[in-house]
Amino acid sequence: MKKEDMLSHLKAFDPAIFTFLQDEIQRQRCTLSLVPTVNAMSPLAAFLEGSALANSSIESCVAGHGNYIEELVRTRAQELFGSEHAVVRLGNIAAASRVALLALLQPGDTVLSFNLRKQEHCAGLNYHFENYGIDPHLQKVDWDEVMQIAERVQPRLIIFSPVSYPRIPNYERLAEVTRTVGAYLWVDIGQCVVLVAAGLIPSPVALADVVSFPTNDSLRGPDGAILLCRKAIAPQLEAAVANTGHIALHMNHLASLGFALHAAAQPKFCAYGEQVLANSKALAAALESRGISLLCSGTETHLVLAAPAAGVDLMDAAQTLCRIGVHVKVDKIPTMQPQILLAALRLSSLNPTTRGLKETDMDVIAEVLARVLAGALTEGEEDTLRMKIAKLLMDKPIFSEEWMNDAFARIDTSSSDTGSIHEHAAHERMSVLKNLFR
């Protein structure tokens, strides 16, 4: 069925869903998200997830067929990150986190976690969490103090999940702390996976027992997660995977994930990562030049933590930015002193980069952010800033063809839906499926 016929049938049969679809496409086209966990999915990965492969799961397919695709995806993950083992049949990062916890810990064990990360995934599980974080004044991790805490609390597991830390971590020092107290080390690289995969920032894989990350956002794949681990503890993780019910992942998800991993091994993905870094640094510099304070002295990743001026309510600022057409994440950054939380907007260059924005565009975005964070908007200026963002996004697609593989660069990704991509892929279905996983 052609895309026009399909949309016509959808509109007639379910106008509520049709309207929701059209409104959401319009929202994504006409607004800009700086939220770290929001990014556009690769059109080819989206095609595979919506393909006939959705009709089969690993559990239901013919003998060996499902194992082939899972092993292919596993091998790609291991080769991309230099890991001894990979678990790829996980539906989301929360599920992956519970698998890791169940595999590594016994009830009552102590966990030393950066900003108490992963505690939110422990419902019904009996672990004792201790916190470490950044120094509230220096706004960086004091590894000597982390060592002192670890020696005092003697954790079974140390977690580093720096979703609110824009600096490059000292993984060697963290591994030293872990070895000193005889603990496991688990690092969640989160949205930094693009920078690790592209070799633009250090990888913790060689030093950590477990490394986790979501497969959407910066990897631009389907919603899911991957666990990388040492071969010695692979049986523990695989047992936890089976015991938590991850036995029937659909082949469309695995194929989509396999494509995303294959794309991440290509030079264009490295170029994408380089632009992500260039954009985040340009955004940070442009904000600072306009008097906006940045936590942690700037950025070395995709992340920028922008603090408001004195007296500016961050929630009000976020709502103002939303009306202007810019979506942001309000955060309170924990520190080594529990009573001190650092308020900031957690901004990411991932989605702007995917849409094709460059350093000069970051300057425009910084101008809008700075006016709101400074609490300096004059009457009628909100409309002016809204028009500025609308003009910036006028010719920007949801997923820029700049980041497409050369074979698909001619696909029109700026259309109001992905129909042209599906149509193109349908015409070349046999050749795509034959050559996709070389």
Stretches with model-predicted labels:
Residues M1-D23:
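Charged, compositionally biased N-terminal leader segments and the immediate start
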